[in-house]
């Protein structure tokens, strides 16, 4: 048995037990999905995403003790990149040997250009990641390069490996014309890798990838990383850390980002501002999500037990109205979290909606929210003349609902797009939906500012105008489809300013 003092001083490593349960779940998932065809709208279910997530994290956690003379002078995470360490990884060895090596046997039969089923796709990408090898069988980093001081060489090798994992997923998506299959590229493969460079090298150099309808989640993943660097210094609002691998964020963090990088909301999270964050952790029984809210800066600790694979989610919404509204859609509820129904997945700003919050529940109480009713008994015995000065009256706080810092400031509202009578019906319906989503978002924002009557009046004016154009659109559809009884629906005067849109004054738009 190792000496306890040596263990304390780190001389003898504490051996991590292999999480065989995640390997068993992975094997069952592969068997279950091996013959499931990948079609245009096929995606990986929430349960299966979390199984994949656990496998990659358990593989990382089981890395062997690193030799002092076999560490990268550049700080590269060689324990997950080289055969020297991966072949010593007990989780990796257990995975390859599990069930008489059946998973490894299946993996060896796969070719990226022949994969057509969900189980094949998952097994191929996951085994490429945990084996530390590129599609052509070459290692990410050769063992002889572990101690190399050649920064350009090491960075280029890691960038190639990171890019190839993503390129391989896009290649399969393009061949099958699939929208939502997605695994990502783990955090350690982004060592000194510029997300913007990866994004442009993949999409600018491959004409076939220009169709953003193919591989939507992959595109969203790479686009986000292209506009948000890994180490943001003074701009960072959040920092995730897992096994020494850190990543900072200044925007809301959608589930496809945390899942694709391998982070979890149960990791160490540091918060650098007093802006509120909503940490989504699981689904609930109302077809919504449960979240924990944190306002104070410092270490964020989710104290809830980790939910089961079919319920667990990973996403963080920043409530920060000083941020760039250009990227506010990353925090929209239905983009933030990957829907379990494939056809409902929203991955772009164009389709993003921020509705359904009434189905969600806050499940925690921060220390500042707790009112201490337990008075000190000694205070009751104090002499009334002990304090010669009366207790000062505190400055008044804004009236509810103003529970957070800076809530007296007006929110930034999204601009409402003008209706366009020239567009086709389908385009105008899409535009109406976009306007509704924008108004709904603005209404949610102004809901926190009950005293902002100017903004509320403006929003009411927009809503009334939208109602008029809804009637106008109904008139045109009725006439073009001959599904109308006379007289046509009447476009009433605007309830606030008494106006009628010009297109409501004639029979034809």
From Swiss-Prot:
Disulfide bonds join 43-342. GO terms for biological process: fusion of virus membrane with host plasma membrane. Residues 366-385 have a biased composition (Acidic residues). Its main location: virion. It is found in: Virion membrane. Residues 389-401 have a biased composition (Pro residues). One of its GO terms (cellular component) is virion membrane. It comes from the Viruses. Residues 356-421 are annotated as: Disordered. Keywords: Disulfide bond, Membrane, Phosphoprotein, Virion. Transmembrane segments: none annotated. Pfam families: Pox_A30L_A26L, Vac_Fusion. Belongs to the orthopoxvirus OPG153 protein family. Envelop protein that mediates acid-dependent endocytosis into host cells. Plays an important role in endocytic entry of the virus by acting as an acid-sensitive membrane fusion suppressor. Low pH in host endosomes triggers conformational changes to allow de-repression of viral fusion complex activity and membrane fusion within vesicles. Also plays a role in bridging the mature virion with structural protein OPG152. Interacts with proteins OPG094 and OPG143. Interacts with OPG154. Interacts with OPG152. Interacts with host laminin. This is Envelop protein OPG153. The gene is OPG153.
């Amino acid at each position: 048995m190792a000496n306890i003092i040596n263990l304390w001083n780190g001389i003898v490593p504490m051996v991590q037990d292999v999480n065989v349960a995640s390997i068993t779940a992975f094997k069952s998932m592969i068997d279950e999905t091996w013959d499931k065809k990948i079609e245009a709208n096929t995606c990986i279910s929430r349960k299966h995403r979390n199984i994949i997530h656990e496998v990659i994290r358990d593989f990382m956690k089981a890395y062997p003790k690193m030799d002092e003379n076999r560490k990268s002078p550049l700080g590269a995470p060689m324990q997950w990149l080289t055969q020297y360490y991966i072949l010593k990884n007990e989780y990796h060895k257990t995975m390859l040997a599990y069930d008489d090596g059946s998973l490894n046997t299946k993996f060896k039969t796969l070719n990226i250009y022949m994969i057509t089923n969900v189980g094949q796709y998952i097994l191929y990408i996951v085994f490429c990641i945990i084996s530390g090898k590129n599609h052509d069988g070459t290692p990410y980093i050769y063992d002889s390069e572990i101690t190399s001081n050649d920064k350009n060489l090491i960075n280029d090798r890691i960038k190639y490996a990171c890019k190839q994992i993503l390129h391989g997923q896009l290649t399969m998506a393009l061949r099958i014309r699939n929208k939502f299959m997605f695994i990502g590229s783990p955090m350690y493969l982004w060592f000194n890798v510029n997300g913007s460079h990866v994004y442009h090298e993949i999409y600018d150099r491959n004409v076939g990838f220009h169709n953003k309808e193919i591989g939507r989640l992959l595109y969203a993943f790479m686009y986000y990383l292209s506009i948000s660097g890994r180490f943001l210094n003074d701009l960072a609002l959040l920092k995730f850390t897992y096994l020494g691998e850190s990543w900072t964020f200044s925007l809301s963090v959608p589930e496809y980002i945390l899942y694709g990088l391998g982070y979890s909301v149960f990791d160490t999270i540091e918060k650098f501002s007093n802006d509120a964050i909503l940490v989504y952790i699981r689904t609930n029984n109302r077809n919504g999500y449960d979240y924990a809210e944190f306002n104070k800066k410092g270490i964020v600790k989710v104290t809830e037990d980790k939910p089961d694979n079919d319920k667990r989610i990973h996403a963080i919404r920043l409530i920060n109205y000083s941020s760039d509204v250009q990227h506010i859609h990353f925090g929209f509820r239905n983009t933030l979290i990957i829907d379990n129904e494939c056809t409902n997945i929203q991955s772009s700003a164009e389709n993003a909606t921020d509705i359904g919050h009434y189905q969600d529940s806050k499940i925690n109480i921060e220390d500042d929210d707790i009112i201490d009713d337990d008075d000190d008994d000694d205070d009751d015995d104090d002499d009334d003349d002990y304090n010669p000065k009366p207790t000062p009256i505190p400055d008044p706080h804004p009236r509810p609902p103003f529970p957070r810092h800076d809530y007296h400031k007006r929110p930034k509202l999204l601009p409402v797009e003008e209706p366009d009578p020239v567009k086709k019906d389908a385009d105008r319906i899409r535009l109406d939906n976009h306007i509704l989503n924008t108004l709904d978002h603005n209404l949610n924002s102004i809901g926190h500012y009950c005293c902002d009557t100017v903004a509320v009046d403006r929003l009411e004016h927009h809503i009334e105008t939208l109602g008029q154009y809804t009637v106008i659109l109904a008139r045109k559809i009725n006439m073009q489809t001959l599904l109308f009884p006379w007289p046509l629906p009447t476009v009433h005067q605007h309830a606030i300013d008494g106006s009628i849109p010009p297109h409501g004054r004639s029979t034809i738009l």
